[in-house]
Design a protein with these regions (language model features):
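Long, charged, low-complexity, helical-prone intrinsically disordered regions
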Residues: 1-375
Length: 375
């Protein structure tokens, strides 16, 4: 592949890397679903449930209808567990084998660096309470936050649900507990050593090696990307990301390229492919890794996308829960969707096509996607 890409070539490289190049094939096993997550490196989770929990949608977008129970098995069934929860991009499902690559982040949290400073101060002021919560999990886990609240007494008396939640977040960030399973999407926490394989927990890797591996995973999943794009995928520290990128280039894993219309230098993964065409049609979760980095989405697709869930209704441009529509290598429209669980119907609250796109060219593939999603 040449060291200069047209914007159309860049889109095809990216879509192939993000697993949109092959014809949808419904996974029949938990391991098959986990393999897709492994190729993406990470799938974001979110509590918003207007349509469906967000972590189910990226897999649907790439492989069509599948049994959601299979993803639950891959994430939480002890004998089939191939995924774990941690802060990858945001709250995420990650391939089990990547657990050691996040230990540096757990150590940063333990030291209270950066965004963890507030939690560190909180647990420092509540040491005995933290110890009591951890002991309860050891004795009775897995437990949800509500099952711990007020269950023991610290030096200041009974503590409440919000304090338990803060403590559990701290224990989760630092790797002392993890998600054993979910109950109506509520995390049930247990000691990490009781959930994940001991051989995995025994692996030690340096911060530099771990970040370098995360950079490579990002590059494989993105195909071609700028430093900003690569850093954002796993939210690496800015200075560390720049150094890891330099090392990956020196190793030959990443190749500097120019992309039509991009001001910044781009980097192509050495194994990236550029298919002749990408014919996929897919509705995308607002939390899909293809469109995480909003500036990247505009650079690649000329598509301005912002999440409007927290925007007052009268100020929204497109709707509350809007899914971009990918068709034949372009983002051609968007739909505001909602699941009416009482009637069992999929509601289309609104929609539009992008400027220059003929409605007649997208109506039929969009209808097919909606029909598939409604199942």
């Amino acid at each position: 592949m040449q060291d200069s890409l047209s914007i159309d070539q860049a889109r095809r490289v990216v879509l192939a890397a993000q697993q949109f190049h092959a014809a949808p094939a419904s996974p029949k096993s938990a391991s098959a679903l986990a393999a897709i997550v492994r190729r993406l490196g990470v799938v974001q989770m979110d509590s918003v449930n207007v349509l469906v929990r967000s972590h189910y949608l990226p897999l649907f977008s790439r492989c069509g209808p599948y049994r959601r129970e299979l993803l639950e098995e891959a994430a939480y069934e002890p004998k089939q567990r191939a995924l774990f929860e941690y802060w990858g991009h945001e709250a995420s499902l990650l391939p089990l084998e990547s657990y050691p690559l996040f230990r540096w982040r757990m150590e940063r949290a333990r030291r209270g660096e950066g965004t963890w400073g507030r939690l560190k101060r909180f647990v420092t002021e509540h040491r005995e309470t933290v110890a009591a919560v951890l002991e309860q999990i050891r004795e009775r886990g897995p437990l949800g936050a509500g099952e711990i609240a007020g269950a023991s007494r610290g030096p200041g008396g009974w503590w409440g649900w919000s304090e338990s939640k803060e403590i559990l977040e701290w224990l989760f960030w630092t790797g002392q507990v993890t998600t054993a399973r979910r109950r109506n999407f509520e995390r049930l926490y247990d000691l990490t050593e009781r959930v994940l394989p001991s051989a995995l927990l025994a692996q030690e890797v340096s911060k530099e090696h771990a970040q370098r591996e995360l950079m490579k995973i990002s590059a494989r999943a993105l195909g071609v990307a700028t430093l900003r794009d690569l850093r954002d995928y796993f939210r690496l520290p800015t200075q560390d990301a720049a150094q890891r990128l330099k090392e990956c280039v020196e190793e030959g894993e990443l190749i500097p390229v120019t992309v039509e219309g991009w001001k910044q230098t781009a980097y192509r993964h050495r194994d990236a492919t550029c298919p002749r065409a990408v014919s996929a049609s897919a509705l995308l979760s607002p939390f899909d890794s293809l469109i995480w980095e909003r500036q990247r989405t505009e650079r690649l697709f000329g598509f301005h996308f912002r999440l409007e869930i927290y925007t007052p209704a009268h100020k929204r441009q497109h709707g509350y829960y809007v899914l971009p529509f990918l068709h034949e290598g372009r983002l051609v429209g968007r739909l505001d969707l909602k699941s009416d669980r009482e009637s069992g119907r999929l509601q289309v609250k609104g929609g539009s096509v992008e400027a220059g796109v003929k409605e007649s060219t997208v109506i039929e593939p969009l209808r097919e996607e909606l029909s598939s999603l409604a199942k």
